[in-house]
Design a protein with these regions (language model features):
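Non-catalytic beta/alpha edge segments that cap or flank active sites
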Residues: 1-184
Length: 184
């Protein structure tokens, strides 16, 4: 396993796979030619997590939000990672769909994604509206639609934050507490 830029894996802790749904947002892709979705699936499985579901939806706020709500309600899904629709064109509406459902936005995810992308694509990173947040006890992350962006988002951020062994802290260990405000 490669080393993260900062932090470390605590090998004394057992690995716990996370159940992840992969959503491709595209008007033109099918599963046969969905390179970005396939990239995410391969990376998730390589790192021993579970692909709980996979789907492709059109660039439409309602279609995206409907699929997200379905997965948020599904106890078999702990995390959703999407690819596509995060740019600035008229059809790019993934962030709007995600943010309409967020109970809490994870601002640092988009900020960190763009910071890391700066070293690879320079000022073009300003076109990315990658977002992350929490809804219904489920983590939601929206990545751009290129295989490279999916690889970067997974390799540089999510693989570490979804590994309960990552130190000094990680998002995986917070999953049991995401809905503690609902408990009395």
């Amino acid at each position: 396993m490669p080393k993260p830029a900062a932090g470390r894996i605590d090998e004394t802790r057992p690995f716990q796979p996370v159940r992840i749904a992969v959503l491709t947002v595209s008007d033109t892709r099918s599963e046969a030619d969905d390179k970005s979705g396939r990239t995410l699936v391969e990376l998730i499985e390589r790192d021993r997590h579970k692909v709980a579901a996979r789907a492709i939806v059109k660039d439409d706020v309602r279609a995206i939000a409907t699929k997200l709500r379905e997965w948020i309600a599904d106890p078999a899904v702990e995390v959703v990672i999407s690819t596509g629709g995060t740019g600035v064109t008229g059809r790019d509406v993934t962030p709007e769909a995600f943010e309409s459902l967020f109970e809490k936005k994870i601002d640092g995810f988009g900020e960190l994604f763009r910071m890391l992308s700066w070293g690879k694509i320079g000022t073009s990173t300003m076109q990315s509206r990658a977002v992350g947040g929490v809804a219904g006890g489920t983590y939601l992350f929206a990545l751009p639609g290129s295989p490279g962006a999916c690889r970067d988002g997974w390799e540089d951020i999510l693989r570490w934050q979804l590994d309960i062994r990552f130190r000094p802290c990680n998002l995986a260990e917070l999953m049991p507490r995401l809905q503690e405000h609902l408990k009395k």
